[in-house]
């Protein structure tokens, strides 16, 4: 019985991981450019991400006001009955128009996705 549970747990861990693809490192941002636009986020998730980013000094916008430096888009989001999600996040430097990272996730806990967003944005030079 223990071996079966261990095998199921191991399978879940292998399937639940996400992968990060980075394309290039964006140029350093200045203090006034520490702005991010969130695109296509569910309202409750958007609120939690906004709160975490604001704690780190980011100005967060849900709409296009034209003065953001970074865009984080949430695409192909599908949630299961337990609230775990599948989809991907696309990180774009709006100063150059280039995508600099993509985070694909399967069967991910929203808290882990939220932490990954903060981690990726904080890795930008100057952030």
Cite the ranges covered by each PLM segment.
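C-terminal motif of bacterial Sec signal peptides marking the signal peptidase cleavage site
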Residues: 13-16
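Sec-dependent N-terminal signal peptides
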Residues: 6-9
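Post-signal-peptide N-terminal segment of Sec-exported extracytoplasmic proteins
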Residues: 35-72
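C-terminal/domain-edge helix-coil "capping" segments
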Residues: 18-31, 44-58, 98-127
């Amino acid at each position: 019985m223990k071996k079966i549970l261990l095998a199921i747990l191991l399978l879940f861990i292998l399937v639940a991981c996400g992968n990060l693809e980075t394309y290039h490192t964006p140029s350093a941002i200045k203090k006034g450019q520490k702005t991010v636009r969130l695109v296509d986020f569910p309202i409750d998730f958007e609120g939690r991400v906004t709160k975490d980013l604001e704690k780190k000094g980011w100005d967060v916008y849900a709409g296009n006001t034209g003065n953001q430096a970074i865009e984080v888009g949430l695409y192909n989001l599908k949630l299961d009955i337990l609230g775990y999600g599948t989809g991907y996040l696309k990180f774009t430097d709006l100063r150059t128009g280039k995508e600099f990272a993509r985070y694909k996730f399967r069967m991910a806990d929203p808290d882990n996705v939220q932490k990954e967003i903060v981690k990726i944005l904080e890795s930008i030079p100057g952030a």
